[in-house]
Amino acid sequence: QADLREYVASSTGDIYRDGQLRLMIDEDGSTMGCIDLFDFDPRNRKAAIGMYIAPHARGRGIGTKAVKLIEEYAFGFLKLRMLYAIIATKNTACSTIYKKEGYEPSSILKAWTIEDNAILWQKIHE
């Protein structure tokens, strides 16, 4: 909890300064998870997406809505040309969200974690 307080206190909310932006996913006053833009590269106009949905909030379309909203911000306001996500191959629920939203698998990352490979999903914005 101290690490979280430190992160919140030190974050400016400026993706250009911090290189990342973390947004909490809230529904009716309850926190359902968070979504991040990180590895922000303004020169090449790309960023990674990370997302966590609390177990009690899964299966309700919250992740899909969060990805759509972060895309609007990334492609519309930040003028990014590419977003990507690295998803463990076992995390089929998350891969389903990205596939449904038009991301394409571009590579398999072998032994990405101790337990699993990962899939690199990309969406190029024309």
Name each region found by the language model.
Residues 26-126:
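Acyl-donor (CoA/ACP) binding surface of acyl/acetyltransferases
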Residues 1-20, 27:
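Active-site rim helix/loop that mediates acceptor-substrate recognition in acyltransferases
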